[in-house]
Every structure is written in structure tokens, then in C-alpha cells.
Amino acid sequence: MSRIVSLSSPDGLTVTLRLPAADGSIAMPEVISFGPSEASDAPIIERASRINGMDEAVASAVLLPTGGMGFFGWPAICGHRSGRDFVLGFCNWTAEESEGRLALAATDTVARMSLRLTLSAHKGGVVSSQVCLTNDGDAPYQLDRCMAGSFPTLAEDATVESFTGMWGREFQTRREKLGTGIWLQENRRGRTSHDRFPMLFVESANQRFGVALGFSGNHQIVIDRCDDGRRLVHMGELFEPGEMLLDPGESYLSPLAYAGADSAAFHSFVRQELITWPGDVMTPRPVTLNTWEGNYFDHKVASLKDQASKAAELGIERFVLDDGWFARRDDDTTSLGDWDIDTTKYPDGLAPLVDHVTSLGMEFGLWFEPEMVNPTSRLFETHPEWVLQVEGRPLRLSRHQLVLDLTRSEVADYLFAKIDSLLSSHDISCIKWDMNRDLTHVGGRDGKAATARQMRALYGLMDRIRRAHPKVEIESCASGGGRVDYGVLKYTHRVWTSDCTDALERLEIQHGASKFFPPELLGAHVSASPNHQTGRQLSLSFRSLVAMAYHFGVELNPLNMTLPEQDELAQFIALHKRLRKLLHAPGTQFRLDPVDGRYVWGAASAERIAVIVAQGSQMVGEQPAPLRLPTHITQFGGRWRIADRTPQQPDFIRISEGQSDLLAGKIDFSLVSLTSAGLPLPMLRPESALLIELEPTTGDPDHG
């Protein structure tokens, strides 16, 4: 007899499975239902065999299908032992059920492989899948593919929403209708990438869910259509040729693959479980000044101290010293890997600057790029063998950099010692951990592909630093948003969303990124105008409001601002501090899909609703549609009014008398009506933004 097992996440997804009979039958666990908890009551009836198919019934929607079970779709696990044992068929399934966890195990006695699949329920309504595959034979097994998880869709027309882009234009939303074949995404860049993020949503008439891979290296996502019209979403690590060879008794442990119902579920999971804060509590996210665009490599201690003093006057709370502080680092061609303080720029070391910053009540942060080395460096001159390379092949430079082989213990020890020394001798609160190139020719000392080992070694180094300095936060940066995922976020506390600080470009970047990442983790800075990446000239108001809801910061030299600009920026910093508790509170955020270039996002509580409206480079048309808010925002009910607006004189194209009264708070309205009728706001000029704050007009707690 087959056995029914299930796993439920609180207020989230439920997975109900049929385990194959424990009689030696070769099969994989069949998915009876996957979705909201009520789906677990689905009728559980064995299906007949296919027409003109195998005599035995072979389920279509199973976890991790393999060819050995008579499955003709895309196999989730495959490999061989010197050309033999190429068919995998698991049997004798067992299940261990505990609160929030379902561990399934099976063996293949012919291929001499064993499989353990662990499904876990996480806070926020997210479930995860992880696979452990072990070679029980007496000869090596070449593992070509092993997905971390498989998640089924309904048998109906579906659309996939994925995220593509490039450097400076990350998280561009892409929607495609799924056809009858395979939808495939592969990333071979050795880091998460700017163009193929390991996360997506699948949506049909009666189902929507998202998946995310907790891994920062090469990955593969496949959506395969089954014989019965359903689809399987597979995701896992992508191996280089010959990379994953399992010796006898050796196991492969996959990354975690996550599934959740919506953005709110993923946000809740990240906040409650994935990210770990110093002291186990997130403090208000400090307004940050990062020195890169204000100084580049031109470090002068006196000027940096003056910038810090001005930053403190403006209300900034964290001062991060970016690239250029270490010896001979006058441009990006030299000295990566050395990590010795430049005694020419800093004759007394970093301590005077660090002490000055902290004396002003600000935190001090420091930039590193630990994984990289310049050929022009003392480290490379001493240890050229320490870089990833393929014997007989030329070293491939990118941004004048080579990649250190972190799988060598001596390399990891060297980097830890350098970082540990600086953190131990200075009052440093955070690290900006950069990584500015893709990986090519990723060969280890044994001559074999080492991409998978390199990523795990990186996690090990980050974990080692976290354990040695538990009060220090880490920001993940990789040429901007090139390493933003649920793997690196286990060891970090913030991500640099993009190297592009142009507020107009940031609208779509932040819109896409915020679907999987809470806003307080996404670095968003006010930069100079004209912008250094695009040359666009944008108002300080627009730049500030676009960054307002995220981990707010500044990317410029404040000494170069006029006094009126400094005053205006200080007002926006004060506004962010007043609203950040609301903007970053769990379960309060919302975002609307952009229409005619108009982006809308914000946060809500029973006492206050903050709505940011930003108009892109195009005009809406004759007039904008009324602003409708989602039901989880209007659920507070009662009558509300606009209590405040920023700026006080918004850049409208035209405005009616009634709209003026509305913005002045003279008109109240039913909050519930905003779900259907909407709020008739005036038309903003292109490249301008408005923040409105709503408050209830009644004293009743339910605002009724």
C-alpha cells in the first residue's frame, strides 16, 4: 500500500504526497496537492496507466522525476558510473515526520545510490526542499544533475514572471506565456548574476506561487510540461562538466529551494528566519553615506573627516569608506589582495578617521573585495598559484582582476587574518563585501572545475568572519546587484541593489527586487545630479523619494552640495527617520504594477498609510487613473484623509480645485473605497514624485 504524507507551513503552502508502496516498486513521491492548506483535502485516488504507455501507472507530477521510473520528461537527477548505472530508479521509501519537517529516504540497489529529500516548513508560509544524494557503490559516480526541488503547477495556461537585466539595470521584470515545451534558465557566471536571478513566479487563473534558490553560484531553473498538462518547476545547482564526482561513500548536498505563495510570504520568511541580526534583533536601518561616488580613489583624510562632520549634521548615521584605502590603490588596476592600509593616504592609519566618525555618533563601515586579486599586487607576485586557473590556459582578466581560489585553506586563512586584524583593531560596524567580476576558467589545484567548491568556500569564509565578529554587519555587493539571493543573505544584512544610482533607473530595479526582498535590506542612495552613470539631471526631491522606503542612504560628497541642497536633503533624511518604522515594519508593505510609467509603493498600519507615487520619463496620457490600493491595505476600514504631502509643492501638470482640497486634507473618504474607486490624484510631471500620508479621521480603533 502507498502512504500519504503531508507538510504544511503556517498560513502558507501545503504539500501532500503519495509515497510509493514499500514493495520494491520503483517510483518517486507523487504530488497530490500543492498550494493553500485547503488543497490538502483533495481526493486521493490512484490513477490509471497512460494510453499507449507503460503498463504500470506512472505519475506525472512527482518530486525529482528520473528516467528509471518510466518518466519521459526532463529528469531532475541524472549521472553515471563510467558510463554505467545511468538509469536511476529509487524504491523502498521511508518517511520521518516531525513538526515542520518531512524527511523522505529511498535507495537504488542497482545503481547503488541513496537519496534523502527533506521538505521543511518555514515561518512566513514558505516551504523548502533539499536533496542529499550518496554514492553507496565501490566506484566513483559522476553526478551530472541534481535539482534541489520540484514544484508542480496546475494544468492550465500559465505565465512565468522572471527577472533579467544587466549591470546597472538589474531586476527587470519579464513575463512570458509558457508553451508546450521546456522553459529554461541557466546561469554560468559563477555568481548570482545581473541577468538571470534564481527566483520567479508562476501564475495561472487559479494559482500563483514563487520559487527561489538559496544559492549564489551557477544555477538551473526548468519548467517542464507533464503529460497531463501540469508543469514541474525544477531548480538547483548547475554543474560544470565533470565537476561533481562522488567518491564511494561521498554525498552531494544541494542548496535549498524555496516556494511561497507571494511576496508577503517571502518577506516574512526572510525577516523571521533567513537573516540573522547582531543581537538577534534588527535595529532601525541606519541612514548611510557611502564614499564611492563622492571620492572614488581620491582619499584625503582631512576632506573625509569634513565629509563625515557634514554627514552627521545632515542626520546620517553610518559612514562607509569605500575602495581606495589600502596601499597603492590609486586606481582599479592594482593592489587588490594586499589589504594593508595606505600609509601615504593614511599616515597614521585608519584610526583617526574611524575615531572621528564614531565620535560624531555614527557607525563606521569599510569596503573589501576579498575574493579578488590584481596581477599587480604583492599577493599575486608572491602566490600566483593562489588564483583559479586552468593549466595551459591563459589567465583571463576582467576589470583587471583575477579570482582567488578560496578552496585552498591557506587562501581562506590569509583573507580571514587580514579582515580579522582590521575588525579587531578598529571600531568597525559593517563590511561592504564587493565582488566585481564573473568567474571563468574556474579550475582548482586538482585541475577540475571548482565553481561549486568555490561558492561553498565563500560561504565558509563569511560564516567564519560572522562568528569571529558577531556584532559586525555585512553588505553583499557584486558590481551592484550581481549577488542578491537567499544563499548569501544567510550571512549578510543588506544588499547593494545596483551600481546604478539614477533614480529613474532605480524605479524598475527596486520594484523587481522588492518582490523577493524586504525593502529595509535593499540599499538605495541619493546620488549627485547629473548622475554619474547616466548623466541624467533629476531633482533632489525625486531622488530622495525614490530611495525613501528602502535602506536609505547617500552616495555623494555632501561638501559639494549648496546650502539649500543640504537643507533639503536633511529634511528628507528626517522624513525617512520619522517613517522608517512604518516603511520597514513586517507585513505593511505594498507595491502596484507600474501603469503608464507610474510606480506606486508604500506601507500601511491602522494609524498611518504612506504612499509614494513616482512618474517615470513618460507622461501618463490625458489623465492618470485613480490610485487604487490593495485590499490588505484598505482592510483597516473607516474614513481617512491626507494628513501630509511631500514635497509641499508637488510638480503637477494640472490640478483641479477638488484635488487641491483632497491634498490639503479637507476631504475625507472611505478607505475601503480606494480598492475599487481609487484616489483621484493629480497628474505628476515626468521624473517627479509625491509622498502622501493618510490618517484616520475618527478616534475609534477600527476607524469605523
Please give the residue ranges for each predicted region.
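Carbohydrate-binding surface patches
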Residues: 194, 199-200, 205, 593-635
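Short, well-ordered beta-strand segments enriched in hydrophobic/aromatic residues
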Residues: 127-135, 474, 608-616
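Short Pro-Gly-centered flexible turn/kink motifs
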Residues: 244-262, 686-694
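Aromatic-lined carbohydrate-binding/catalytic grooves of carbohydrate-active enzymes
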Residues: 280-417, 430
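Glycine-rich, aromatic-flanked loop segments that form ligand/cofactor-binding clefts
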Residues: 57-90, 198, 203-219, 260-279, ...
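C-terminal beta-sandwich/jelly-roll accessory domains of carbohydrate-active enzymes
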Residues: 618-704
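Polysaccharide-binding surfaces and accessory modules of carbohydrate-active proteins
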Residues: 3-6, 13-21, 25-224, 240, ...
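Active-site neighborhood of glycoside hydrolase catalytic domains
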Residues: 347-349, 381-541, 551-556, 560
